[in-house]
Amino acid sequence: KQGNKKDSFEPGIELLGKVTVFAEGCRGHLGKQLIKNFELNKGKDPQQYGIGFKEIWEIEDKNHEEGLVMHTAGWPLDNSTYGGSFMYHAENKQIFLGYVIGLDYKNPHLSPYDEFQRFKTHPAIKKIIEGGKRISYGARALIEGGFQSLPKMFMPGALLVGCDAGTLNMPKIKGSHTAMKSGMIAAETINEHLKENKNLSIYDEKFKS
């Protein structure tokens, strides 16, 4: 309480490195501070955010078609709110069902979770999950500004990767792919930086090429 050290006190550990990679995900606590302090988003469009819900269902065999992919846009949202869904038929009679809604919606009474539940009442969705059971669920924030909102991803002694930078490609619905690729390019960049003394700015060039 008074700031006095007890016998069990352990000082914090200093982790030192020539290059630090920040990979905290969407709007990471440290990442957003770095973007602000180093003005990494100067001249870029404002970032956009969304919330995504995902459920894993085990459905009846007659409703399952392994490999089937379904994407939708709009309903049940109105014309002033953007969002859409995905459904992937996986193996073992499982489907991955989800809905994403932009967080710039104007209606203060809109509940993204309730809209997702309403979406599941659509006949095309209801007939697939009817008789099945939900076995897992989750939600996460998404960074959706795209290429025009992508900040500089390098700064002195550090790199941003994945959603900490905003690498999600919304038009192609590619998030994990671009995040992993940014990590691979970050590793290549650090290797060249340490071995050949190349500037960390090559990370941006490599990622955008």
Which ranges hold each PLM region?
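Predominantly flavin-linked oxidoreductase catalytic cores and closely associated redox partners
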Residues: 1-127, 185
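Domain-scale detector for complete catalytic domains at protein termini or as standalone homologs
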Residues: 3, 132-133, 138-142, 206
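Alpha-helix capping and helix-loop boundary segments enriched in small/acidic/polar residues
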Residues: 44, 107, 149-152, 170-178, ...
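Conserved alpha/beta core surface patches that mediate binding of polyanionic ligands
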Residues: 71-83, 138-151
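Flexible, glycine/charged-enriched surface loops at secondary-structure junctions
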Residues: 127-138, 196-202
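FAD-binding beta-loop-beta segment adjacent to the flavin cofactor pocket
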Residues: 139-170, 201
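Extended, hydrophobic alpha-helical segments in both membrane/secreted and soluble proteins
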Residues: 154, 160-164, 176-190
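Active-site-proximal substrate-binding core of FAD-dependent oxidoreductases
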Residues: 166-172, 184-209
